[in-house]
């Protein structure tokens, strides 16, 4: 028996589900799990053999920085080992960002994540007066390119501060208008407790 010739249908044969001792055949349609049987007699255009390996829901990575991925190859050494120096080094790198390089590095990271079972990512992307909206636009482009294999949520992230880094508040509004999903914050980056408090207030406005 054959199922309808739907290119979105998939049968994964010989897959072990958590808690089961016997491998099963799994039927998926339109990207969603439908049913399983120990020996599914139907056939499908697309079939995979899991080889008796465990089949579980994919993983979620809720905190990643795709705009900074793979920058270690060109970054200076963090001799102090502190967050402050790491941010300073990142700031220097940011001045030389290009859209093509950002998309390439983000893509490498997305493919690596998916190949290891991660299909949902939340990425923070710097928004400030150094890189402007270039990193955001590049990551939005990467999200579109890889939308068939990963769900990517984008956080507009004011790492250099909202008050300390002039113009960032306006850039954050523009980032949300252009496709960022979440407003991020980093009150630590401000110069005083009062400014950190105001930073938090702005994020929730």
Features from the language model and the residues they span:
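Divalent metal-coordination and catalytic microenvironments
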Residues: 15, 31, 52, 63, ...
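Active-site metal-binding motif and surrounding structural segment of the metallo-beta-lactamase
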Residues: 39-56
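Divalent metal-binding segments
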Residues: 83-133, 188-190, 194-195
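Hydrophobic faces of well-ordered beta-strands that scaffold small-molecule active sites
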Residues: 58-62, 121-123, 150-156, 183-185
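N-terminal metal-binding scaffold of metallo-dependent hydrolase/deaminase domains
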Residues: 1-43
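Histidine/acidic residue-rich metal-binding segments in metalloenzymes
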Residues: 134-148, 164-205
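Active-site gating loops and adjacent loop-to-helix segments of metal-dependent hydrolytic enzymes
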Residues: 69-102, 179, 203-205
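Di-metal (Zn2+ and/or Mg2+/Mn2+) metal-binding site signature of metallo-dependent hydrolases
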Residues: 53-75
């Amino acid at each position: 028996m054959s199922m309808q010739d739907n290119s979105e249908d998939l049968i994964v044969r010989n897959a072990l589900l958590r808690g089961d001792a016997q491998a099963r055949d799994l039927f998926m349609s339109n990207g969603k799990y439908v049913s399983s049987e120990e020996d599914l007699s139907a056939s499908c255009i697309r079939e995979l053999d899991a080889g008796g390996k465990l089949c579980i829901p994919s993983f979620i990575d809720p905190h990643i920085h795709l705009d900074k991925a793979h920058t270690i190859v060109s970054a200076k050494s963090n001799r102090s080992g502190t967050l402050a120096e790491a941010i300073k080094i990142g700031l220097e790198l940011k001045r030389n960002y290009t859209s093509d390089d950002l998309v390439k590095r983000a893509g490498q990271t997305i493919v690596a994540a998916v190949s290891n079972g991660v299909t949902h990512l939340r990425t923070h992307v710097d928004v400030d007066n150094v890189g402007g909206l270039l990193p955001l636009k590049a990551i939005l482009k990467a999200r579109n390119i890889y939308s068939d294999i990963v769900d990517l949520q984008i956080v507009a992230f004011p790492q250099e501060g909202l008050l300390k880094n002039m113009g960032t508040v306006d850039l954050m509004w523009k980032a949300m208008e252009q496709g960022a999903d979440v407003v991020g914050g980093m009150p630590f980056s401000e110069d005083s407790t009062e400014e950190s408090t105001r930073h938090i207030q702005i994020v929730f406005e």
